[in-house]
A protein has these predicted regions:
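General beta-strand structural signal in soluble alpha/beta enzymes
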Residues: 37-40, 93-95, 118-129, 153
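Short, ordered loop/turn segments at secondary-structure junctions
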Residues: 17, 39-44, 76, 97-101, ...
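Generic hydrophobic/aromatic pocket-lining and core-packing "Φ" positions
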Residues: 25, 57, 82-86
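NAD(P)-binding Rossmann-fold cofactor-contacting core
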Residues: 22, 30-48, 122
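Rossmann-fold NAD(P) dinucleotide-binding segment
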Residues: 62-63, 68, 72-99
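Conserved anion/nucleotide-ligand pocket segment
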Residues: 129-156
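Rossmann-fold NAD(P)-binding glycine/threonine-rich loop
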Residues: 98-120
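Glycine-rich adenosine-cofactor-binding loop
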Residues: 10-23, 150-156
Length: 156
């Protein structure tokens, strides 16, 4: 996670802009997070508060160059979403989704080995770095103040 602390900016892609994903994405934006794109298979071509929505992670990455991927997709599709982000070159992935079948995550674990990827989750609230105005996940921004400490949670 140190690469996040040392970067000038952190550009976030959100995959899964359904009801919950949209609500939490707005909370990230309100905190100051730079959300550069969204991904939703049936909302491609639309936008979420001015943020373009694409039909695939690959297209979103090509057009918006995110550093971080945030996943809110339903459990049956979450492992494929993680792999799609890995294949698209995203190196820091936060998966909020809970209830992913164990065999799906074993597949992800085997796939991620040897790759330059950091996966936080699944079933986690994400992370929050107040001094960088960076909130990736569902941790409430109202519980923190500026300072030298960030919050990382790997389990819900």
């Amino acid at each position: 996670m140190m690469n996040i602390l040392n970067k000038e900016s952190n550009r976030v892609l959100v995959q899964g802009l359904g009801r919950d994903g949209s609500f939490q994405t707005q909370k990230c934006i309100d905190f100051g997070t730079e959300i550069v794109s969204g991904v939703h298979p049936t909302k491609a071509g639309d936008n979420f508060n001015g943020i373009p929505i694409y039909g695939s992670v690959e297209e979103a990455v090509k057009k918006t160059s995110p550093d971080i991927g945030l996943i809110f997709v339903p459990a049956p599709f979450a492992s494929d979403a993680i792999i799609e982000q890995i294949d698209s070159g995203i190196e820091t992935i936060v998966c909020i989704t809970e209830g992913i079948p164990i065999n799906d995550m074993l597949k992800v674990n085997n796939y991620i080995l040897g790759k330059n990827v950091r996966l936080l989750g699944p079933n986690c609230p994400g992370f929050l770095i107040p001094r960088k105005k960076l909130k990736v996940g569902i941790i409430p921004g109202s519980i923190v103040s500026d300072g030298k400490v960030g919050v990382v949670s790997r389990s819900g």
